[in-house]
Amino acid sequence: MLDIQQLVKTYENGHQAVKGVDLAIHQGEFIVLVGPSGCGKSSILRSIAGLEAITSGEIHLAGRRVDNEKPANRDIAMVFQNYALYPHMSVYDNLAYGLKNRGVSKATIAEKIAKVAKTLKIEEYLDRKPAKLSGGQRQRVAMGRAIVRDPQLFLFDEPLSNLDAALRAHMRLEIKKLQRELGVTSVYVTHDQVEAMTLADRIVVLKQGEIEQIGTPAEVYHQPASTFVASFIGSPAMNFLAASISDGKLQLAGKQWSVPYDANLNCNTLTLGIRPEHASLHPVDDAIELSLNIQVVEPLGPNQLVHGKINGEYGDEDFIAVTAEMPLTIGDNLPIWVRVEQLHLFDEQEKRIPISAQSPSVDTHQQQRQQQ
């Protein structure tokens, strides 16, 4: 439906914001572009909209090349972070403005606005000016202005970043429900990984103008392609421990475990990734055992974050575990278990090494030698 081919965007100062991005988006799909500031996500969105002239590449919408067309001719509607409403116009006139410019009849405009206002629950605001609306109400109006145009593609440029946390959570649900009802292909830009996880059919993680990974929220979370993706998606972020692997044995904190791997791998500078919520306080089968020296406990109500140090391959390293709420003593060593199937291995280039679940075995002979 939307096909981006080898998109490059270089600014006049020589900065290349987008570096040959390829992306195919299906009809009705909700795609979220996510990444830190400067990753190129907004440049891609503005290039699709026609607000930025691309340096090279092609953009096709429904089989039609649009990168050489004016923004008004692309059949795309955009929802901005700052709402972009006309302050001197009523909500009704803001909704009607684009349709009037296209020569749509008054009767058709009234019909479209009535339908959209009912869908977005803004009927009672139609006579008000934007200044009389709350942030959430303004965002609904901005979305309504995009919807009445009946475009082939919706673009969302960090639309919730000006709202408080509670309203953001509510509006996330509103946007997701609305997109499902309308079935319009949508591209959404955010730096917030929670928005990405909750809204997207597929997430596109960007780093320095290039795509680091494309996948469903579950794929990106459970099979991150790199340490960058693993650290960016998930809160608290994934823990990383320096480890090594030799002859099929993972070496960490003076212990060895047999772990499955796809190739004959020997690596002296492996990175082991562990999600904080995968640290169990009870022995489990097919797991490695570590010892967490407790330094800080953050109670969150239903659970708590336990911050501490774990003895890694090259010294103590920071680690966070999510546990049930319970009394813990600062300075104590807390034994934790992590299932092998929940471990993430990354190579020297910080790229994922695929592994599958298999029972680990502690090399007791080496432990005995170290104890002697």
Swiss-Prot record:
What the entry lists under CDD domains is as follows:
ABC_MalK_N
One GO molecular function term of this record is: ATP binding
Q: Topology with regard to the membrane?
A: Peripheral membrane protein
Q: Which domain of life is it from?
A: Bacteria
The reactions it catalyses are:
sn-glycerol 3-phosphate(out) + ATP + H2O = sn-glycerol 3-phosphate(in) + ADP + phosphate + H(+)
Q: Where is the ABC transporter domain?
A: 2-233
Task: Please describe what this protein does.
Answer: Part of the ABC transporter complex UgpBAEC involved in sn-glycerol-3-phosphate (G3P) import. Responsible for energy coupling to the transport system.
Similarity comment: family membership: Belongs to the ABC transporter superfamily. sn-glycerol-3-phosphate importer (TC 3.A.1.1.3) family.
Protein name, per record: sn-glycerol-3-phosphate import ATP-binding protein UgpC
Q: What gene name is given for the protein in this entry? A: ugpC
